[in-house]
């Protein structure tokens, strides 16, 4: 990889790390922030769900805009908007201001991921592209791991401090992008017209895909993976506050442990386990394991026990998503892009539904998010036993032919 490409990828990696650091930092803070404004679980769930909802809507739009206007201006807009949203969070004194800040940040930060990936595709050879995307993935993971711990620690004295710091880092990163990152898409290579984004057609395709097998079952699994994880993460701060009296620092470290365990699990265990047992078997076992861990979490009474049960939940959940993605890819040997797009859409739906559901049932009883989450994962396990083919059935067919 050329020196200029390495420099550009370093700037892009910093951009993604900053954005994901911001997302990670707010997770342990939100529960305490909204409680100080008199809100509870239902408001927290809706606040968290805004981000994946806006990303689902606006990421394709930003990708289309970058094809016409270039990558650099879209990336700059995303960083500027995200920095402003963090500043608004820090200045918020009422609940509605949090929702406005979250919405603005989600809409504009949705530009960063598709644009950085497109930048790498523009500026690297096919041989170097995988390495470049891998570096961006590592930066994303680093931001998500460090964010909760850093946010929880910075919020000990003031809940606003992490937001102001993130806003400042965003603006510094914006300067790096504006001053040192060249445009990767020449004017002659840009589209003259916008790509048509048709949400109704996308929803129709998602509905048709659900009726096919095994694709529909795998898409259901993709939904359940995200639903289970966000059901846990979204409400955990309020659960920890009500059950144990934990503050932002303890919640931040616990969520950081989730990120570390997930990264180690996916890096070390996913390959050997799926190679040995096959993706279908891994999906079935991890669905049941995640459900059991949800119930065990309710029995934990000390910090070591909480960490242990959360690790027991994180390991199978971390194995589940790559197994679902891999099996979806194998069962769609043609039209891979359609299959992966559907997988991402159902993943986003799970990230929207999980925190909303957890927040509303938390207001009924603080144990219900995890009990209901366990029940839903058990239902997924039963569905996988009945309808998910085993490893020996590997023949793939085109996605559209089945939907």
In which residue ranges do the predicted regions lie?
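Conserved MFS/SLC helix-loop-helix module at the cytosolic interface between two early adjacent transmembrane helices
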Residues: 56-93
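Helix-breaking motifs and short loop linkers at transmembrane-helix boundaries and internal kinks
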Residues: 38, 70, 91-97, 108, ...
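Juxtamembrane intracellular "pre-TM" segments in multi-pass secondary transporters
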Residues: 1-5, 182-219, 402-403
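Cytoplasmic helix-loop-helix junction between adjacent transmembrane helices
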Residues: 101-142
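Helix-loop-helix hairpin linking two adjacent transmembrane segments in secondary transporters
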Residues: 136-179
